[in-house]
C-alpha cells in the first residue's frame, strides 16, 4: 500500500513539475525590447573591401526575450554624430588623438532603411539593415565609424543599454592578411643570412598593400610606418612565361609577386 501511495505521489509531483515547465515556456521570461546587435559592446566591427564600386555591409536590429514577436515592429533609427565624440573622450586620451575614431562622411555612405526598418514577426525576431559604402578613398590608418541610434519603435520598448553603437569599418582587399615571410639578407663581404618572420599585409587601396619589410616589427606609430614599410601596387600584368605571377610596383621600382595557395613570394 505504501509503495502504491509513493508511486501516486511521485506521479502527481511529476505532472505538477511538467505543468509548471509548460507554463513557463508559454510565458515571456524576460523583458522584450528592441536593440542593435553589437550595441552592448558599444562598437560593432564589420569588414568591407576596398572597391571602385559601392560595397554593401549590414548591421542587425533585433528583439530580446524568450518568445517570438506577435506583431511586426517598425524601427526608426538616426545618425548621431555626438556618439563619436563621447566615445573618443571616454576611451582615448589626449595623447591618443591620432587614434580617435572618425565619423565617416555622410556623402560616402547611405542607409536606405534607416528611418523605416521593419522586423517582420512571421520571419523571425530580427532584421538586417543594409549599408552602402564608397571605400575607394578611405585611409587604412584612420578608424572610420558610422554612429547609429534607435530613435523610436512600435509595439515594444527600446533597450536602454542596446539602442546606440558605433559601426567600425575594417578595411580589406584581395591581398591583405597574414603571411609567413621567407628570405635572406646579404651584407657586403658577408655570407647571406636566412630570415623568416610572420607579416601582416595591410590594404591601402583596391590593388595596393603595405607591409613592414625585412625584420622590422609591426607598429601603429606614424614614425615607424614612415620609416619601416613599403607599399606594393599589384598590377594586372602577368610576367612573361608564367601563369600566376603578377608584376608589382615597389616605390617606383618593379618587382614580381607570386601567388600560390594564398601565399606571396617577393
Task: Describe every region a protein language model picked out.
Residues 10-14, 251:
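Generic signature of intrinsically disordered, low-complexity, basic-rich segments
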Residues 15-19:
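C-terminal motif of bacterial Sec signal peptides marking the signal peptidase cleavage site
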Residues 3-10:
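Sec-dependent signal peptide recognition
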Residues 21-118, 126-266:
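Intrinsically disordered, low-complexity regulatory regions in eukaryotic proteins
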Amino acid at each position: 500500500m505504501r509503495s502504491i501511495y509513493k508511486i501516486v505521489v511521485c506521479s502527481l509531483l511529476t505532472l505538477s513539475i511538467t505543468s509548471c515547465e509548460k507554463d513557463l515556456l508559454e510565458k515571456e521570461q524576460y523583458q522584450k525590447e528592441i536593440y542593435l546587435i553589437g550595441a552592448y559592446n558599444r562598437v560593432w566591427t564589420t569588414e568591407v573591401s576596398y572597391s571602385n564600386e559601392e560595397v554593401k555591409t549590414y548591421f542587425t536590429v533585433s528583439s530580446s526575450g524568450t518568445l517570438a514577436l506577435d506583431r511586426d515592429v517598425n524601427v526608426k533609427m538616426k545618425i548621431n554624430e555626438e556618439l563619436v565624440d563621447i566615445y573618443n573622450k571616454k576611451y582615448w586620451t589626449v595623447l591618443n588623438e591620432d587614434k580617435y575614431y572618425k565619423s565617416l562622411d555622410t556623402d560616402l555612405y547611405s542607409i536606405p532603411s534607416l528611418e523605416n526598418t521593419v522586423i517582420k514577426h512571421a520571419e523571425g525576431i530580427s532584421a538586417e539593415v543594409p549599408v552602402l559604402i564608397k571605400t575607394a578613398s578611405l585611409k587604412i590608418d584612420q578608424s572610420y565609424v558610422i554612429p547609429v541610434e534607435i530613435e523610436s519603435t512600435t509595439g515594444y520598448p527600446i533597450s536602454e543599454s542596446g539602442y546606440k553603437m558605433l559601426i567600425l569599418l575594417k578595411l580589406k582587399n584581395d591581398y591583405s592578411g597574414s603571411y609567413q615571410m621567407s628570405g635572406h639578407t646579404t651584407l657586403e663581404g658577408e655570407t647571406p643570412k636566412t630570415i623568416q618572420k610572420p607579416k601582416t599585409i595591410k590594404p591601402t587601396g583596391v590593388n595596393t598593400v603595405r607591409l613592414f619589410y625585412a625584420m622590422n616589427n609591426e607598429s601603429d606609430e606614424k614614425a615607424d610606418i614612415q620609416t619601416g614599410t613599403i607599399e606594393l601596387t599589384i598590377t594586372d600584368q602577368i610576367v612573361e612565361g608564367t601563369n600566376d605571377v603578377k608584376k608589382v610596383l615597389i616605390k617606383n621600382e618593379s618587382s614580381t609577386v607570386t601567388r600560390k595557395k594564398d601565399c606571396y613570394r617577393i
